[in-house]
Amino acid sequence: MNTDWNSPQGDFDTAEKQGELLMLLSRQQVTVHTWDDPDFDYMEEQDLALVVQSPSGTEDLLIELCGEFSVFFEKWHGEYAATAEDYAQLQQDITAILDGKAGALSLYTENGWQGTVLCTELPGAEDATAAAALKRCWQEAKPDTVLPAGSRLELVCWDPAQNRKYQLPEE
């Protein structure tokens, strides 16, 4: 078992994909960071971070290339092994977020934040069943997590005009 979490965790070294990812992000404003940048001093010397700056000045997208790939958007965090299959999913998820086809869906209850999932079934602004669509998205990602009555779902998207908040009805 490999216990060095900063060494490649799959078929290739994540740093090998930096150029491909920068091409994928070529329409965006991206900054590249290493372990010697003050905000990234938690990383190992060989690690890289790509920060995709939000054009609206709200939530940036952070992509870390360490022993595996990690993506952070709002409160959502996705992890992807350095395998062809996971790398393809990483590209798909990043593209969906940036194209406004996915967002970070968070659940809040009386006990506070309960978790966040990547929601790829975004309701339209006039969608009468938007709350149902978001509830379904949450339940598909976390089928064992109950959505208590009175809890709140918050969807954060790359384009803040798509953001939504829904209070689940009290029973």
Positions of predicted regions on the chain:
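N-terminal domain-onset segments
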Residues: M1-D47
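Acidic, proline/glycine-rich low-complexity IDRs
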Residues: N2-S7, T95-E171
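Alpha-helix boundary/N-cap detector
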Residues: Q9-F12, E16, A81, E85, ...
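Amphipathic, interaction-prone secondary-structure segments
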Residues: V32-F69
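Intrinsically disordered, low-complexity N-terminal regions enriched in serine/proline/glycine
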Residues: T34, D39-D41, F72, E79, ...
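Short secondary-structure capping micro-motifs at structural edges
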Residues: L48, G57-E59, E74-A82
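Secondary-structure transition/turn motif
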Residues: Q53-P55, F73-G78, E121-G124
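Long, charged/polar, surface-exposed segments that mediate recognition or autoinhibition
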Residues: F69, K75-S106
